[in-house]
Design a protein with these regions (language model features):
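Short, locally clustered residues in the helix-turn-helix/winged-helix DNA-binding domain
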Residues: 31, 60-67, 127, 155
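Exposed, interaction-prone assembly regions rather than primary DNA-binding/catalytic cores
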Residues: 146-166
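N-terminal leader segment of winged-helix/HTH proteins
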Residues: 1-49, 96, 148
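N-terminal positioning helix adjacent to the helix-turn-helix/winged-helix DNA-binding module
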Residues: 22, 54-56, 146
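Charged, amphipathic alpha-helical coiled-coil/dimerization segments
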Residues: 2-5, 9-14, 91-149
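N-terminal helix-turn-helix DNA-binding core of bacterial DNA-binding proteins
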Residues: 39-84, 166
């Protein structure tokens, strides 16, 4: 419960709802585990494929899109990134001939990111090692019921935060 008290200025300030020891343990385990997992996945992808997790995710989303292309705004939403950060990542992928940008023919204003044949080849080459790293460092450590709980919990977190971030 939040405790409310007045400051000397007369302004009312709410006391923070501090985490219980159990809540703090869960939060820290999540933060530490997530950081270590993403570091391990990034390391594997960079070592084996010269890709980051963010770049891999871009290639995956483009590979799943009709005509292997998406508007930059849709792609930014899909990878949960700012448009400026995505533009930087797309430039790096363009330099490696994995992605190309085109003007959207529908309105002539939007920009499409399109996965090239080289990008698809690199994704297909990177995928087996990446999936193995995901299995080894995450999936295989959990029982099916735990995976369901994680999917439910983070689906809910994503949905709630998504309602307010946009």
């Amino acid at each position: 419960m939040t405790t409310v008290h007045p400051e000397p200025s007369g302004r009312v300030v709410a006391e923070p709802r501090w985490l219980t020891p159990a809540q703090q343990r869960a939060w820290r385990a999540y933060m530490d585990g997530h950081q270590r997992l993403m570091t391990a996945l990034n390391r594997q992808l960079q070592r084996d494929s010269d890709l980051t997790v963010a770049e891999y995710r871009i290639l995956v989303l483009l590979s799943e899109a009709p005509d292997r292309s998406l508007r930059m705004s849709e792609l930014a939403d899909g990878v949960l990134s700012s448009r400026s950060k995505l533009t930087h990542q797309i430039r790096r992928l363009e330099a490696q001939k994995m992605v190309r940008r085109n003007t959207c023919l529908e309105d002539g204003r939007g920009v499409l990111a399109e996965l090239t044949d080289e990008g698809l080849r690199r994704l297909q080459t990177a995928a087996p090692g990446h999936v193995e790293a995901v299995r080894r460092n995450f999936i295989d450590l959990l029982a099916p019921a735990q995976l369901e709980v994680i999917a439910d919990v983070f689906g809910r977190v994503d949905e709630e935060i998504g309602k307010h971030s946009g």
